Amino acid sequence: MKKHSSKTVLALVLFLGLAFGCQQKQAEVKDESNDSSLYQYEGEPLRVAIIGLVHTHVHWILGREKVGDIEIIGIVEPNRELAQQYSEQHGYSMDLVYPSMEALWTEKQPEAVFDFGRIYDHLATVQFFAPKGVDIMVEKPLAVNWDHAQQMAKLAEEHQVELLTNYETSWYGSTYQAKSFVQDTAKVGPISRLVFNTGHPGPIEIGCNPEFLEWLTDPVLNGGGALPDFGCYGANISSWLLEGAAPLRVSCVTRQRKPELYPKVEDEANIFLEYEQSSVQINASWDWSHNRKDMEVFGNSAFLHCLNGQDMEYLPSEEEGRTQLKADALAPGFHDPFAYFVQVLKKGHTMEPYALASLENNLRVVQILEAARISAERREAVEFKELFP
């Protein structure tokens, strides 16, 4: 295992409980493109339950400021020790904790649930709650494979419930600024190429807890390693920016750079998507030197680099040179996944086609991830239409 100084380890885990799934910390750089202090809510709260605590993005909702838009009425987690630990950290009553979805439903009937369990278990959550008319949001990606995704989508459609998928990058001001630049032909215009660099030094290296590592590094429970964990971000945003277009071909090379740490799964994946007029490159890794989720957008002549949630570099032309930009703030109520879910369920917000959280987008994401996995196994490019006619 790599040796890190205590200073380096501290830097790696600062915040990134939200960003990379381990400790809940404060961000080293305040993201002013996402200011929750402006958010005010009026009306009855959305009564929600949390399904699972083993995905540590759960700290996002447990540590969220109470603004009256959601009310946590129950938590499903069979691991009482973990539930007790988080109870002491966040101050919720253990009376809210139930050992199963059945036990929760006997006493409480939530309007919506947020799934922070294993990706493999997303299907079971939808199978249980969709027939009861309960709306659902899961953590990215939607499902471990295309078979699970199809079953989930069918249930959501049959029972007319929302099935949304949450990504950290959906709440980056820079993500939306990039789309506005693409839509403006005077700024970037039609996309010729997208490049995504996503990941971190590794879940073990950044200090993820055992309950998270147990399934995150399992090929069945997570659907793979770095490929689904960080390949999904680029697949999600590119499907949105390219308005749901399906790639023509998908190529992927996976590696095990640290088999002593991650013997069951790939810790790096390089995905290449070919489209009619553009291409997408996704570099997903648990072996970066640092935490990163950045995006490069190439137009015919202009270039935009989204360095993080708020900082961007814009190159309109070689002659004009680079300009440093800050992303615009997200609108209150559309600044985090929980407020957004309330907007959809309580305030009548209609998602645009292939919206980042939408089911249609995330079905495409699962298709891309599955095609990438097959490409890596075959060691050749795969035709998308042959896999998904």
Segments from the language model and where they lie:
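Bacterial N-terminal signal peptides that target proteins for export
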Residues: 1-10
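C-terminal motif of bacterial Sec signal peptides marking the signal peptidase cleavage site
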Residues: 19-21
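N-terminal Rossmann-like dinucleotide-binding module
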Residues: 23-91
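C-terminal helix-rich "cap/oligomerization" subdomain common to oxidoreductases
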Residues: 23-41, 112-114, 344-389
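Contiguous beta-strand/loop segments that form the cofactor/metal-binding neighborhood of enzyme cores
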Residues: 30-31, 35-42, 234-311, 339-349, ...
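Rossmann-fold dehydrogenase core element
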Residues: 36, 151-169, 192-194
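Beta-loop-alpha module in the N-terminal Rossmann-like domain of NAD(P)-dependent dehydrogenases
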Residues: 92-155
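Predominantly a Rossmann-like dinucleotide-binding segment in NAD(P)-dependent oxidoreductases
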Residues: 172-253, 257-261, 379
